[in-house]
């Protein structure tokens, strides 16, 4: 079962959708389709042990300089150790590592949010450019950890606010420490446990209120461990990677997340098996998403807090990551949003305040212009736009 696939190699154009999702089994870690695709691609029998380097025409892959032998009962298998790379900082700078001339790409987040026509701003977000020290990972295996997330609340702001305040704290507490055989498997388990614990904490607090809180929230989180992105997603917020394609000499929008709505076969089957139903594209005719934090009244009907988790290795061809709630994607396709941001980044007329680097001013302007444009196009929802710059 293909649980944890990789993005397309960077020199290739984005792949078309692979068609229908596999029926009857959950696919949490699959190959990442192009952003316009709604179905998941199917790949080979790759699990979590060894991550193939993302090939690049002239950039090469990030090499490792050592390997470790992992012994199992009756047989041994060689596995490459992940890159040993420098600790990241709040400022976006190129971080070079002597080991095999590897480079950790700097990450820095920017955000803009608009209430739109809603009475209340129910979105929340988190930007943590570097939480390596807080996570305290094994320095021989992991040397930079970053975290970026957007949360789109419904039924109130309490679930999204709770997730923004607590999910990364739970992640830090559960982050792998000590000896690790497989970083990929351990990080995956950490994310699954973190989402489960955060949801349980909120539901406990919500049920203790009188009347009980009925708030819920989507969650789209990008956890960067050195040059590997782990994307955990619940609901219909999205993460998109802008990657330059050397063959077409154009930038492509690659989807890093999978939307969860009750009309999808796998989601609908789970809901019906739990005793719920889907009417008018909604759980029990009310809830638009099939996975969320909170929504206690729907958890007994098959709505789950188990995230879809995907993995992507950054390459020198990657420009930025876009995280946004559905308020943006109701009026922008992923390709349109990526091209809009690129046009802003190339705008020489953007003014820079004294003491602020020009690149920061352009990314801030890109976030604000895209959020404004979404409102102008008629998005009636809250709009949150986060762009994570990838430095080379």
From Swiss-Prot:
Positions contributing to Mn(2+) 2 binding: 152, 326, 381
GO cellular component term of the entry, any: cytoplasm
Residues covered by the PPM-type phosphatase domain: 108-390
EC number: 3.1.3.16
Modified residues (N6-acetyllysine): 210
Coiled-coil intervals: none
Signal peptide extent: none
Main localization of the protein described in the UniProt heading: cytoplasm
Co-factor remark: Binds 2 magnesium or manganese ions per subunit.
Residues covered by region (Disordered): 1-91
The protein's enzyme class: hydrolase
Xref: InterPro entries: PP2C, PP2C_BS, PPM-type-like_dom_sf, PPM-type_phosphatase-like_dom
The protein's required cofactors: Mg(2+); Mn(2+)
Biased composition (Basic and acidic residues): 72-91
SMART domains noted in UniProt: PP2Cc
Family to which this protein belongs: Belongs to the PP2C family.
Protein name per the record: Integrin-linked kinase-associated serine/threonine phosphatase 2C
Organism name: Mus musculus
Taxonomic classification: Eukaryota, Metazoa, Chordata, Craniata, Vertebrata
Gene (name only): Ilkap
